[in-house]
């Protein structure tokens, strides 16, 4: 059975699926707070949906900042994201359907 992801985790996964990003990029892309994004990145990586790598210390030093950890989506993450998006799109008509009033039987 596929792992159920929270809406926040799906937003993070979707943001990273657009290319390799570091944590603050994901915060900007999702408009989620860091206290949500960084734990989600950690869980998504632990569960095999993301992979990460550290940038070169040389590059970071040249720019006068600490090294960034870059995240990319895995094949498993892409499959999970696409499955979740298909499910959400299938549910959209149900969520947005107008319900007509029901008349009393009495």
Give the role of each language-model region:
Residues 67:
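Exposed loop/turn and edge beta-strand positions of beta-sandwich/beta-sheet ligand-binding modules
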Residues 2, 75-106:
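Amphipathic alpha-helical dimerization/coiled-coil segments
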Residues 2-38:
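N-terminal helix-turn-helix DNA-binding core of bacterial DNA-binding proteins
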Residues 37-49:
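Basic amphipathic alpha-helical segments that dock to polyanions
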Residues 47-64:
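Beta-hairpin "wing" of winged helix-turn-helix
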């Amino acid at each position: 059975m596929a792992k159920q992801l929270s809406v926040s985790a799906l937003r993070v996964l979707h943001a990273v699926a657009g290319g390799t990003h570091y944590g603050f990029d994901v915060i900007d892309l999702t408009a989620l707070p860091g206290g949500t994004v960084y734990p989600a990145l950690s869980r998504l990586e632990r569960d095999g949906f993301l992979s990460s790598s550290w940038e070169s210390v040389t590059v970071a030093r040249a720019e006068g900042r600490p090294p960034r950890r870059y995240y990319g989506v895995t094949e498993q993450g892409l499959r999970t994201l696409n499955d979740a998006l298909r499910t959400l799109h299938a549910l959209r008509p149900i969520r947005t359907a107008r319900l007509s009033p029901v008349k009393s039987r009495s």
